[in-house]
Amino acid sequence: MPKIQKQISALYTSAVLGNFSLTGAWVAILTARGFRLVEIGIAETVFHITSLLFELPSGIMADVFGRKRMLIVSALMQLMGNLVMMFSRGLVSVCISMSFTALSYNFSSGTGDALAYDSLKSAGLEGRYEKFQSNLMTIYRLCGGLSTLCAGFALALGYKIAYGTGLVSQAMQICVLLTLREVMPDRPRQTEPILSKFSACIRESLSFLHTARKALCIMFCNSLVGALDTVLLFFLQAKLPARGIPQQELGAALLLMELGGVVGARLILHLSRWDYPSVFLTAAALVAAGFLAEHAVAYPVMVLGGFLSALGDDALQVRTNALLQGMFPSQQRATLTSVESFTFSVIMVVLSPLAGILFTYW
């Protein structure tokens, strides 16, 4: 039990170091640097195209080479992204930075979840995974909210110093990740060549997806809601100042919207009797309300809409992750979790440029 607690605590600490930064309101920072919303939409599209290309390979690498190693690679990619952004001058260098950041997400998405679930499963505690996911989503939202709260501070410091602090965070994160214990399912093919392991992982994952159509449907529903919430919150960073919110209140408003996700992640733990369709429909309705609130004359209504959207998104995310992890076989857990992230990226590649145009002219 103490070893499991140490393992889970290290994953929580890594999540804090990987998600808290002075540059959380990166859309606002780019806007302040003179980038247009359409350009920001292009940068976001590059991010998701990179995710699209490397999401599945990164998941397979985690299942073949080890989850701990890929989490360390993830931190290194984030470090490179911050370094490039520090010296960026135009859209091209910003896009390169976004690509490194996308790779960071690729190597961590699914990998940490797989390591956590198999760690809990090895101790017979897999029933606690939904609580782990709730805590993790709370960390993500709180770190994201606190990061955006630092928006004014980051703008005052300058983007170079702001991104420079991320280099320190990633170095600390790597030190924490080195303390993790690798937990991999027993494999009968440990002596097989690497290419054989890759092909076997792909073949078995495809076989699972072919027979588990329900899992694919769940992935799509969750990714669609998550993508809509993501683009809404991203562009509200730029729309709120245009609607008249005082600069000193922007960080607090962005934090409040992120706290909606915290409420959703905690609330879903008390709704165990709700079936998945009920959770999905409620989450979709809350995100739709957020989009409608974006047109409100008063910016507090826009903030409330963002809060409700985040609430629905994270409640659905926690329930989805717990449901899917219980369905996935351990040997392909990271790969199959990456399929969900891949689905999200496909939707975001389409939505990001459309949202940039939509929020500019609508």
Predicted features, each with a name:
Residues 1-5, 181-218:
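Juxtamembrane intracellular "pre-TM" segments in multi-pass secondary transporters
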Residues 32, 85-87, 144-165, 169, ...:
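Transmembrane alpha-helix termini and helix-breaking/packing motifs in multi-pass membrane transporters
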Residues 52-89:
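Conserved MFS/SLC helix-loop-helix module at the cytosolic interface between two early adjacent transmembrane helices
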